[in-house]
Curated annotation (Swiss-Prot):
Segments for region (Interaction with RNA): 126-131
GO annotation, cellular component aspect: tRNA methyltransferase complex
Biological or metabolic pathway of the protein: tRNA modification; N(7)-methylguanine-tRNA biosynthesis
Binding site for S-adenosyl-L-methionine: E46, E71, D98, D120
Pfam families the record matches: Methyltransf_4
Residues forming the catalytic site: D120
Reaction catalysed by this enzyme: guanosine(46) in tRNA + S-adenosyl-L-methionine = N(7)-methylguanosine(46) in tRNA + S-adenosyl-L-homocysteine
Organism whose genome encodes this protein: Lactobacillus gasseri (strain ATCC 33323 / DSM 20243 / BCRC 14619 / CIP 102991 / JCM 1131 / KCTC 3163 / NCIMB 11718 / NCTC 13722 / AM63)
Family per record: Belongs to the class I-like SAM-binding methyltransferase superfamily. TrmB family.
SUPFAM superfamilies cross-referenced by the UniProt entry: S-adenosyl-L-methionine-dependent methyltransferases
Protein name (database record): tRNA (guanine-N(7)-)-methyltransferase
Length: 217
C-alpha cells in the first residue's frame, strides 16, 4: 500500500545520511563497517519494511545483532527513520532503495536472516518477476546469506504463500517451518513472533497468517 507523501519524511531522510542510505548507487560499495558500531555481529535484513514496526521492535529486542531495513517508499522510510532517531536504535541502519539491487549493496555471505513480511503479492501473471519470492530474488538472497543463514516469510495472502512454497521448492530450498495459521500455532516460533502493522490488523480480523522458514542447501 502506497502511503500519502509526507514532505517532512523526505527532509528527514536527506538530513540523516549517517542513518539511512537514500537511493544508493548499486555500483558503489557500501562501507557497512563504518555504519555499524560492530559489523561482526549477526546481521538480519528486512526487505519491504513498511512503517517499520517489525524491524524497530526486533532491533530493540536484540542489541546483540545488527539490522538493516530496506524500504522503497520515501515516506515509509522516513517514518522508520523517525522512530530510529527518537528511540536511539543504534543497531539499525536503513536503506531507501530497490530490493532488486540487494546483492550489490551487501557483501556475499554476510547476512544471517532475510525477512519478507507481507510483501506485495503482485497477483497478475505478467508481474510475477516482481514478487519477492520469484527465482531471481532467491538468487540474490542466496548470494548475501551465510551458508547457515535462512529466509523467514509471512503473509496473509494465500495465493502468494502457495506461489512462494512452489517457487522455493523448485529452487531447491529446504523448509524448516511451515504454518497455515501462525497465530494459532503453539510453538516457539509464535512465542518469538514480532508482528508487523499489517499482521496485527489482519490477525485481528480473524485472517490466518501464513508463515514459512527455509534455507538454501
Amino acid at each position: 500500500m502506497r502511503l500519502r507523501n509526507k514532505p517532512w519524511a523526505q527532509k528527514l531522510v536527506v538530513e540523516h545520511p549517517e542513518a539511512i542510505l537514500n537511493e544508493p548507487d548499486p555500483e558503489k560499495k557500501i562501507n557497512w563497517e563504518e555504519r555499524f558500531d560492530d559489523f561482526s555481529k549477526p546481521l538480519a535484513i528486512e526487505i519491504g519494511s513498511g512503517k517499520g514496526q517489525f524491524i524497530t521492535t526486533l532491533a530493540k529486542k536484540h542489541p546483540e545483532m545488527n539490522f538493516i531495513g530496506v524500504e522503497l517508499q520515501t515516506t515509509a522510510a522516513g517514518m522508520i527513520l523517525r522512530t530510529k532517531l527518537e528511540e536511539k536504535i543504534d543497531n539499525l541502519q536503513l536503506m531507501c532503495a530497490d530490493a532488486a539491487n540487494i546483492a550489490m549493496y551487501l557483501p556475499e555471505n554476510s547476512v544471517d536472516v532475510v525477512y519478507l513480511n507481507f510483501s506485495d503479492p503482485w497477483p497478475k501473471t505478467r508481474h510475477e518477476k516482481r514478487r519477492l519470492t520469484y527465482k531471481s530474488f532467491l538468487d540474490k538472497y542466496r548470494q548475501i546469506l551465510k551458508p547457515e543463514g535462512h529466509l523467514e516469510f509471512k503473509t496473509d495472502n494465500q495465493g502468494l504463500f502457495e506461489y512462494s512454497l512452489v517457487s522455493l521448492n523448485n529452487y531447491g530450498m529446504k523448509f524448516d517451518y511451515v504454518s497455515l495459521d501462525l497465530h494459532h500455532a503453539e510453538n516457539e516460533i509464535l512465542e518469538r513472533n514480532v508482528e508487523t502493522e499489517y499482521e496485527h490488523k489482519f490477525a485481528a480480523k480473524g485472517n490466518p497468517i501464513y508463515c514459512l522458514h527455509a534455507h538454501f542447501e
